[in-house]
C-alpha cells in the first residue's frame, strides 16, 4: 500500500525526522488560507499523486511549456495561481503512463536553502535477507540513472535486525553521504529514526529523495515515498486509514476483495495464471512472441470457482484487453475448478475476445471435458509455448 508524500512526512516526523512546515489542501481557497499560516517568503507547491517524477511531469490540460507538478512560489498570490493550474488537472509523469493521474490535493510547504541533495532509502535486500540502507550523494535525480551510469556512487549498508542501526552502521552511512560537522550529527541521529519507522510500521520501502543538507548545515527530509507490506496492514489500522482509493486502479481494488494478486499493465492480452512464477513466465513468453500482457494475475493455489469467476470478470473489464490466456498448472489448484469458473464468468459477462486455455495437472482431463462440452468458442493449447503463439496469433488476426 502506498501513501502520499505529506502523509509519509507526517509519519516520519512522529518518529523525530526533521521536515519543513507544510499543509495539505484540497481547493484553491484552502491553498490561500493555509499558505498565509506558513512563514514564507518561499513556498513549494507539490502535486500529491502516487507517482514519482512529478517535478518533470506535464499537465495534459496546460500548454507544453507550463511548469510541472512541483513548483516554487515567492508569495501567497503565486501559491494561489499555481493551485488554480494544478488542482483538478491531469499530471503525466514517467511513472503514471500516458493516462496520467488527476491532482486532487496539494502539499504546500516552506522552501529551503539547499546546499546539497542526497539520496536515501531503506528496503529489504533479499540477497542477504536483511533490511538495507541504499544511499548516494547524487540525490534529487533519477536513482535508476545513477545506478546505470555511475553505480560506484551508490552505497548499500545491510542492517542486522537483531542489533538495529549500530554506531558503525551510522558512521558508514555518514561517510558514504560525505556528511560533516552539524550535518553528520544530524545524519547519525536520523538513520536509526528512519530504521525504527521502517520496521515498526512494516514498510516495504522508505525512500527519501532528496534528503537535503541546508546552508546552515542542518539535515532535512525534503521528499518522502513510503510503501507498506500489504500482508501486515492488519497490524496497523492507523496506516489503513491513510489509504487513498482514488489513486489505485479500480481493477486492483476489486481483485484485493477476492485476495487475488493482480497488477494492471499496458498491454492487450489478459492473463489468468496460478502461481507467481508461472504468471511471470507467461508474461515473458507473450512478449517473446511480439505482444504485451495486459496484467499480472495470480489466482493462487486454492482458488474457488467464485474466485476464478471474479478473476475472469476483472480481466474482461479492461477495455484494452483484446485476448485472454488462461494458463493453469494444477497442483493444489484443480483444473476442473478453473474450467467451471471460466465458464461461469463467460456466461455472465459474455466472451467478445479470443480465449486460449492451457490446462495441465490435477483433474486436467475433467477440466478439458468441461470446457469442450460448454459450447464456448475456446482455443485449447497443449503447452505454454503453444498457448502463447495461439493467443498472439488470434489477437493479431483481429
Swiss-Prot record:
Q: Which cofactor does it need?
A: Mg(2+)
Q: What NCBIfam families does its record include? A: PRK00696.1 (NF001913), sucCoAbeta (TIGR01016)
Enumerate the catalysed reactions: succinate + ATP + CoA = succinyl-CoA + ADP + phosphate; GTP + succinate + CoA = succinyl-CoA + GDP + phosphate
Q: How is the cofactor bound?
A: Binds 1 Mg(2+) ion per subunit.
Q: What is this protein called?
A: Succinate--CoA ligase [ADP-forming] subunit beta
Family designation = Belongs to the succinate/malate CoA ligase beta subunit family.
Q: Which organism is it from?
A: Brucella anthropi (strain ATCC 49188 / DSM 6882 / CCUG 24695 / JCM 21032 / LMG 3331 / NBRC 15819 / NCTC 12168 / Alc 37)
Q: A Gene Ontology MF term for this entry?
A: succinate-CoA ligase (GDP-forming) activity
- GO biological process terms, semicolon-separated: succinyl-CoA metabolic process; tricarboxylic acid cycle
Which cysteine pairs are covalently linked by disulfides here?
Answer: none
Under Enzyme Commission nomenclature, its number is 6.2.1.5
**Pfam families documented for this protein:** ATP-grasp_2 (PF08442), Ligase_CoA (PF00549)
Residue positions annotated to bind ATP are 46, 53-55, 109, 112, 117
State the protein's purpose. Succinyl-CoA synthetase functions in the citric acid cycle (TCA), coupling the hydrolysis of succinyl-CoA to the synthesis of either ATP or GTP and thus represents the only step of substrate-level phosphorylation in the TCA. The beta subunit provides nucleotide specificity of the enzyme and binds the substrate succinate, while the binding sites for coenzyme A and phosphate are found in the alpha subunit.
Keyword vocabulary terms for this entry: ATP-binding, Ligase, Magnesium, Metal-binding, Nucleotide-binding, Tricarboxylic acid cycle
Q: What class of enzyme is it?
A: ligase
A single cellular component GO annotation? cytosol
> In what residue span(s) does the ATP-grasp domain sit?
9-254
User: To which pathway does this protein belong?
Assistant: Carbohydrate metabolism; tricarboxylic acid cycle; succinate from succinyl-CoA (ligase route): step 1/1
Q: Which InterPro entries match?
A: ATP-grasp (IPR011761), ATP-grasp_succ-CoA_synth-type (IPR013650), ATP_grasp_subdomain_1 (IPR013815), Succ-CoA_synthase_bsu_CS (IPR017866), SUCC_ACL_C (IPR005811), Succ_CoA_ligase-like_bsu (IPR005809), Succinyl-CoA_synth-like (IPR016102)
Q: Which of this chain's residues are annotated to bind Mg(2+)? A: 209, 223
Q: Where does substrate bind?
A: 274, 331-333
Amino acid at each position: 500500500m502506498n501513501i502520499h508524500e505529506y502523509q509519509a512526512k507526517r509519519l516520519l516526523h512522529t518518529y523525530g525526522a526533521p521536515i519543513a512546515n507544510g499543509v495539505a489542501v484540497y481547493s484553491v481557497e484552502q491553498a490561500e488560507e493555509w499558505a498565509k499560516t506558513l512563514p514564507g517568503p518561499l513556498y513549494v507547491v507539490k502535486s500529491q499523486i502516487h507517482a514519482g517524477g512529478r517535478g518533470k511531469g506535464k499537465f495534459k490540460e496546460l500548454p507544453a511549456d507550463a511548469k510541472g507538478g512541483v513548483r516554487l512560489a515567492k508569495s501567497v498570490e503565486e501559491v494561489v495561481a499555481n493551485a488554480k493550474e494544478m488542482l483538478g488537472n491531469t499530471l503525466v509523469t514517467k511513472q503514471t503512463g500516458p493516462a496520467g493521474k488527476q491532482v486532487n490535493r496539494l502539499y504546500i510547504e516552506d522552501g529551503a536553502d539547499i546546499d546539497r541533495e542526497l539520496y536515501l532509502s531503506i528496503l529489504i535486500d533479499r540477497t542477504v535477507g536483511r533490511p538495507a540502507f541504499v544511499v548516494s550523494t547524487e540525490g534529487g535525480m533519477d536513482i535508476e540513472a545513477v545506478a546505470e551510469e555511475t553505480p560506484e556512487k551508490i552505497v548499500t549498508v545491510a542492517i542486522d535486525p537483531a542489533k538495529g542501526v549500530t554506531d558503525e552502521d551510522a558512521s558508514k552511512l555518514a561517510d558514504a553521504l560525505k556528511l560533516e560537522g552539524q550535518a553528520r550529527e544530524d545524519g547519525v541521529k536520523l538513520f536509526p529514526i528512519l530504521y525504527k519507522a521502517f520496521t515498526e510500521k512494516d514498510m516495504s520501502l522508505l525512500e527519501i529523495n532528496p534528503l537535503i543538507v541546508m546552508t546552515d548545515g542542518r539535515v532535512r527530509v525534503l521528499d518522502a515515498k513510503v510503501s507498506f507490506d500489504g500482508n501486515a496492514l492488519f497490524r496497523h489500522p492507523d496506516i489503513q486509514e491513510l489509504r487513498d482509493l482514488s489513486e489505485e486502479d479500480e481493477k486492483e481494488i476489486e481483485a484485493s476483495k477476492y485476495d487475488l494478486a493482480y497488477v494492471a499493465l499496458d498491454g492487450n492480452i489478459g492473463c489468468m495464471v496460478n502461481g507467481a512464477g508461472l504468471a511471470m513466465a507467461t508474461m515473458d513468453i507473450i512478449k517473446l512472441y511480439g505482444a504485451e500482457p495486459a496484467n499480472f494475475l495470480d489466482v493462487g493455489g486454492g482458488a474457488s470457482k467464485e474466485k476464478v469467476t471474479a478473476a475472469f470478470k476483472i480481466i474482461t473489464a479492461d477495455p484494452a484487453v483484446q485476448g485472454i490466456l488462461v494458463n493453469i498448472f494444477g497442483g493444489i489448484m484443480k483444473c476442473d475448478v478453473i474450467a467451471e469458473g471460466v465458464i461461469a464468468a463467460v456466461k455472465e459477462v459474455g466472451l467478445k475476445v479470443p480465449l486460449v486455455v492451457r490446462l495441465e495437472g490435477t483433474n486436467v482431463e475433467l477440466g478439458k471435458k468441461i470446457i469442450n462440452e460448454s459450447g464456448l468458442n475456446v482455443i485449447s493449447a497443449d503447452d505454454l509455448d503453444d498457448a502463447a503463439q495461439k493467443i498472439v496469433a488470434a489477437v493479431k488476426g483481429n
